[in-house]
Amino acid sequence: METTSTERTAGRRRDPQTDAAAIEAVLDLVSAGATLSGLSLVTIAEHVGVSRNTLYRRWKTKEELYLDVLNAVNRPLPEFGSPTPREDLAAYLAILIERTLDRRAGSVLRALQAEAQAFPELHRRYFDEIIAPRRETVYRILRRGIAAGEIRPGIDIEFVGELLVAPILARMASGAIEKLDPETTGHRIVEHVYRGIQA
């Protein structure tokens, strides 16, 4: 089970319901048009219906809360172990699409991307703690594909990993992600990429 940034802070008594309500509040407010820069812990506390000190006891800064929000929308991945790495790649992409189809999750992810320069430390931790481990999952699947003889040895697995997710990120940026069917699109992307990397 992953430990969030705030759970590592000693001495804080946590109320899971309040924590969940604060995360939901950020998702609601950002999806309604609020910016990450414009929000404050005071505003979020008012939306939840608790005192600001209640939130300050949990998160010293809104950036800490935002990291917990990002952890919440990026749920842990399942174990990938199908007989063919190709199927695992398609399943991974389907999960990524399902996440971005969530309107509120998509709003927060786009907001973070738009305000990355305003929150460099948050953006760095999001990459290090959430994105990088997921990329490594893709790399492991690709290595399995090479070992199984599905994929041609010598490919640049980091570049191929970027090729796999690029169509999804492009659709998310343009607001056209809702037109995608997760399972069908995941398989289509993998089939197209495999034409260039299969053994």
Residue ranges and their predicted role:
Residues M1-H47, E64:
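Basic, helix-initiating cap at the start of DNA-binding domains
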Residues V48-W59:
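Short hydrophobic/aromatic patch on the recognition helix
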Residues A94-L101, L109-A118, E191-I197:
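Helix-loop "lid/cap" segments that line or gate small-molecule binding pockets
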Residues A22, T61-Y66, P76, L89, ...:
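Short amphipathic alpha-helical segment with a characteristic S/N-K-E followed by hydrophobic residues
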